[in-house]
Amino acid sequence: MKRILLSSDRSGSGKTLITSAIMRALSKKYKVRGFKAGPDFIDPGYHKIATGFPSINLDLWMMGKNNVKRSLAKYGKEFDIGIIEGVMGLYDGVDTLYSTYELAKVTKTPIILIINCSNIGSTVGAIVKGLKYYRSDVSIRGVIFNKIASETHYNYCRNAVEDVEVLGYVPFDKNLEIKSRHLGLVTVEDNREVQNLIRYASELVEKYVDLDKIYEMASDEDLEIDLPEDNESNGVKRKMAIAYDPAFSFYYQENLDILKNKYELEFFSPLNNEYVEDAEAIYIGGGYPELHLNELEKSTRTKKWLKNMSYAGVKIYAECGGLMYLSKNLIDENNKNHSMTGIFDIDIKTKDKLTIGYTELEAVKENFIVNKNNVVRGHEFHVSKPISVNEKEFVFKVRIGKGIINKLDGVKSNNTVASYSHLHFSNFQLRIVF
């Protein structure tokens, strides 16, 4: 598979929409796989709309270099081109070791820059030159200008750029805007207008951007990584129930694929008061439970089922929004209590300061996620805050990050474990046996 990476000098440059538009435009001629640098759950949804295929996260912090290369190779099989969307600015991250730049270097992928040119002209030449020559061990091949006001504006920008090929531009258009919410861009599930937005943006890209040159610039250099054979179980698979609806939609595609090797996956919707009676394991991911408090409070059958399964010792794993749902009460911005499942004696305020960043967790107690004394990396991404925690058993000591309380995460009751950290199951320290 050929591959190219789209990056920028900062967040807010239009990467997600332009990347999705390019994916959609190229999909008319090629089989395109989307990838996303970093831990983001939302942008891959846009990629899926654009290509028709799930987008795959590539995160050096959580996955490590070899697993990133394996995922790129594995999910690139049978595709003509992989398009990787970067995160933040090209050199941003915990440090450059976990940046988009490092991802491009590790995966031997050439870079095309997307630069927001609103309110600048010739200065774009200095921005592009700075990005290109700040490091010399990656290949910045092209640049696309965003928010170009006129042909004259485009010419000023184009004439200022040296040593990098200008591939075209996207004109300023007030209709080209993805709305934001407190955790970033609105999710695809929330906004059905996203499909029309990507379609419109792709029409502009087809008109103003050299798509053939993008495909030509993409690299097919060998990743020099061995792909292990799929270790899918040959026996009868146990059933795993996975919460999935607009309140719980934050799942990595690769995590689901890893679980499919061992389990028959059946999805259920807490918002619709559903449950899976014969489940032998349960997984509740993150999302936006704070936007669906009334419906979740009324999901009495789901909550009763989860509580009974927890008491019976069934393995339940929950992340972030899942932790909130398994708690006792969620308190909204008007200080109104909403009763949740109550497996954990924890009350959580649903809207507080944003907590976002990578985590590093040490397993200090035996559990079914990580062997004791092992260390695993994840990330936190929420605006909620526990205000009452009457639980004593936690399986993780937080070495980097915040966790639930007092640098502890992974609250445990029976065989139920819930944490604020999201984990990527490709990490070799994890034992996803459920």
Curated annotation (Swiss-Prot):
Keywords: ATP-binding, Cobalamin biosynthesis, Glutamine amidotransferase, Ligase, Magnesium, Nucleotide-binding. Its EC number is 6.3.5.11. The record marks 422 as: Increases nucleophilicity of active site Cys. Pathway: Cofactor biosynthesis; adenosylcobalamin biosynthesis; cob(II)yrinate a,c-diamide from sirohydrochlorin (anaerobic route): step 10/10. Coiled coil: none annotated. The keyword Nuclease does not apply. Comprises of two domains. The C-terminal domain contains the binding site for glutamine and catalyzes the hydrolysis of this substrate to glutamate and ammonia. The N-terminal domain is anticipated to bind ATP and cobyrinate and catalyzes the ultimate synthesis of the diamide product. The ammonia produced via the glutaminase domain is probably translocated to the adjacent domain via a molecular tunnel, where it reacts with an activated intermediate. The a and c carboxylates of cobyrinate are activated for nucleophilic attack via formation of a phosphorylated intermediate by ATP. CbiA catalyzes first the amidation of the c-carboxylate, and then that of the a-carboxylate. Catalyzes the ATP-dependent amidation of the two carboxylate groups at positions a and c of cobyrinate, using either L-glutamine or ammonia as the nitrogen source. This is Cobyrinate a,c-diamide synthase. It comes from Saccharolobus solfataricus (strain ATCC 35092 / DSM 1617 / JCM 11322 / P2) (Sulfolobus solfataricus). The gene is cbiA.
